[in-house]
Amino acid sequence: LEEAQLIRTELKPGVRGSMKLCLRQNDELLLLLRKGEKKKKEEVISMPVGNYVDYKVAPTCGIVNTEDYIDGEDEPRCFYNPLRTTAKLVWFAKGYLEYRFPNAGIQNGQVRRLELSAELCSEAPDYNMEWPSDITLWINQREAGTWTCPSDFGGRRGKLNPDWWEDKNTQYGKLKVWTLEENGTYLDGKKVNDVSVTDYCLADGPFISVRIGVKEDAKHQGGVNLFGNSFGDYPQDIVMRILYE
């Protein structure tokens, strides 16, 4: 008690020697009990670019894996080929791809933040450094922001591209990051709207819908190249990070 400075002691003369006198240091004690802090958890889901569940595309379009083209080029019907799940690069001039991410882990929690990142660029025949495209992300049918990509990037080889991929083709993209926060939605750290993470209703359905594409009324309808973990500059697929309590 002395070490905790709750009391102090003094020695006083007594009838048969000395006695120890205990004196309190404080008149009142206030005891505060901390509320248990909710532990935050993070779930990371990597979605291969060929694992789309729905699409609407128009030429120029195609799919490749690390070995070769999957079916022919510029034929939207080829996007149904079951080998699409091995795809490492997907491209299309118009339309969208839709993915479904699992949400079982957040059913009993509260989502604080969702982050989605992917390597992207425009789509032109071969490549074209002057080819803008307004690439939009939708999450559960709500717009999460549009990035105007300036180019279908080429002119130097993508760091991960296999040797057989020709130099005249699209080579790399830019890594773009959309973030859903409690106070709004951000693209590469810049706020794009006031739609909060709760507004996307991430746990309401059986999955989280993610759609990447170009609007039919977009100013720059320059298509999309979507890179997997073996093409372009970044060794990743479409990556979703969910922070929840």
Give the ranges of each region predicted by the language model.
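Extended, solvent-exposed segments with strong compositional bias
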Residues: R77-F92, P150-A203, H220
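A short, conserved structural fragment
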Residues: E2-K12
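Amphipathic alpha-helical dimerization/coiled-coil segments
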Residues: L29-T85
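Proprotein-processing/basic-patch segments
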Residues: G213-E245
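Extracellular and analogous surface-interaction loops
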Residues: E98-R112, V197-A203
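A short beta-strand element within beta-rich, extracytoplasmic domains
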Residues: G109-M129
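Short, cationic-aromatic polyanion-contact patches
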Residues: E10-K35
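Short coil-to-beta strand junction motifs in C2/discoidin
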Residues: Y127-I139
